[in-house]
């Protein structure tokens, strides 16, 4: 495995084998291994079940219901998704279990989601859902059913198992081979000890190939549209959903030089860098250029806006992150050094890798300071900063704050 210039070894980098991608062929005696696939009713989990079955594993499926809502509403697709999952399992001849994790989801994911928005931050519930539900509640339940592994349809990979410096058997999280679909960003908070019990059958495939396999097996999900957005919101407007749970307080929209030019509907509805949906028309004595959200003034309930895609108030050189989850379970040793850990980072999904240096802010590595080589645009508190060396995802944490904006 090649290293980026000046990249340092981490506690997870115990050997080359620790980074070698695991394939289904690496697992001995698959006919004796019981795998339960998280069946979402989509094409990716459907094909995952097919690939595991073809590789000789004992395969069963499990459909999770994580959100309680009237199944007859236009927004809830749970019944249709369950029907599709059942149809796929019937087609390939495997059993489908069902489990309701709605209580766990509310307690561990949704309440945090609401608290973050109330505090003016922009959370990513999918990351917490993976950590707390799909790779904790689901994994624990599957183990009670006698599973040796769980499997999901995520476009990511993991390494062969190895023991970290504390003797815990773990696996590394690796990027999926389809760069356009790689989901390692969303799985960075899943511990390596959980990954060691997980298989990602489609992680080495590209999406068109996955759909082709589904078509070849005449699966009902072959041409099913990919789900997008936050799972419990569905296709409804985000603002309509959120106002059911959090009362909104209108306030002033203020320019970067202090001029009030409008009224916002509630700070929680806006995110840094946002362009559309602000509700600003033509402004006297201002150029006909787009307006962007630059900041939220929580104390005064003001939305700060300005013009210019690269406005100085949207650019920052550093961020502070907390609630760090390290895939290796142990933090990389170099974050405690004077020079820090050289690596790449993403502060949002699909962002190109950004070179940076990571320094620990406390003794256990659960809080860090990240210094970027180049200024970053619209780094958003509540989102996650995720760290990589080559194809290996080291982990990440929640963005707490950024430094003083560049040039201000």
Curated annotation (Swiss-Prot):
Keyword annotations from UniProtKB, A to Z: ATP-binding, Cytoplasm, Disulfide bond, Nucleotide-binding, RNA-binding, Transferase, tRNA processing, tRNA-binding
Gene responsible for this protein: mnmA
Pfam family, one: tRNA_Me_trans
UniProt organism field: Psychrobacter cryohalolentis (strain ATCC BAA-1226 / DSM 17306 / VKM B-2378 / K5)
Site (Interaction with tRNA) location in chain: 154, 383
Catalytic residues identified in the record: 129 (nucleophile), 231 (cysteine persulfide intermediate)
Alphabetical list of PANTHER family matching this protein: MITOCHONDRIAL TRNA-SPECIFIC 2-THIOURIDYLASE 1, TRNA 5-METHYLAMINOMETHYL-2-THIOURIDYLATE -METHYLTRANSFERASE
Intracellular or extracellular location(s): Cytoplasm
Domain of life: Bacteria
Annotated segments matching region Interaction with tRNA: 181-183, 348-349
InterPro entries, A to Z: MnmA-like (IPR004506), MnmA-like_C (IPR046885), MnmA-like_central (IPR046884), MnmA-like_central_sf (IPR023382), Rossmann-like_a/b/a_fold (IPR014729)
Main location: cytoplasm
Protein name: tRNA-specific 2-thiouridylase MnmA
Similarity remark: Belongs to the MnmA/TRMU family.
Residue numbers binding ATP: 38-45, 64, 153
Record-level GO BP terms: tRNA wobble position uridine thiolation
Disulfide topology: 129-231
Function as written in the Swiss-Prot or TrEMBL entry: Catalyzes the 2-thiolation of uridine at the wobble position (U34) of tRNA, leading to the formation of s(2)U34.
Region (Interaction with target base in tRNA), start-end ranges: 124-126
